[in-house]
Amino acid sequence: MTTLETLKWDGKKAGKVSIDLKVAKETSSADLIHRAVLRQLANKRQGTASTLTRSEVRGGGRKPYKQKGTGRARQGSIRTPLRPGGGVIFGPKPRSYNLDMNRKERRLALRTALMSRISDFKTVEDFGSTLDQPKTSEIINGLSRLGIEKTEKVLVILDNPSDVIKKSINNLEKVKLIAADQLNVFDILNANKLVIGQSAINKIQEVYAS
């Protein structure tokens, strides 16, 4: 069990909260997280790249010139891959890049990745009530009060983010908002700092504890 210091949105200390998640063994954690990230990135690929082979390119049915007597290399079609406008040899065709990983492994990888970033956590009291209308500057100032630089990539994890918070964060290039029950390994590892709402900690333990 790890105890985290909770801060108010103004940066002052507010108390403490505990988080206890089962993680992978140190000997296998790196491989597990690596496979989880590969799966996530592979499954995002559309796999729609497609080229035409020699037989699929339009035209080229007639032999361009006679076989012998021209002094040139023999050609059977103007759509040969050797000529501009011809077919493509071993080009890509639509395919699925999806990788499989069972649910227990995915959950274990996520918990391990999350707990490995514990030193980069900024646990805050839920600050949705402090914003009555979308205001990007308030998010910027709030992150600054938490000791986060403007150049750092930030992942904000909240239990049930309101539309006001979503709109306030939407314009910030280096800040990403995600719900506590929709976490993924890549975003956790890609961020420099993780700002987690106090109720999100409870939600994470409820959803990902097993």
UniProtKB/Swiss-Prot annotation:
SUPFAM superfamilies, sorted: Ribosomal protein L4 (SSF52166)
GO CC terms in record: ribonucleoprotein complex; ribosome
InterPro entries registered for this protein in UniProt: Ribosomal_uL4, Ribosomal_uL4-like, Ribosomal_uL4_dom_sf
Tagged with keyword rRNA-binding: yes
Transmembrane segments: none
Gene Ontology terms for molecular function: rRNA binding; structural constituent of ribosome
Compositional bias segments (type: Basic residues): 60-71
Quaternary state and interactors: Part of the 50S ribosomal subunit.
Known role: One of the primary rRNA binding proteins, this protein initially binds near the 5'-end of the 23S rRNA. It is important during the early stages of 50S assembly. It makes multiple contacts with different domains of the 23S rRNA in the assembled 50S subunit and ribosome.
NCBIfam families in the record: rplD_bact (TIGR03953)
Entry similarity comment: Belongs to the universal ribosomal protein uL4 family.
Identification of the protein by name: Large ribosomal subunit protein uL4
Source species: Prochlorococcus marinus subsp. pastoris (strain CCMP1986 / NIES-2087 / MED4)
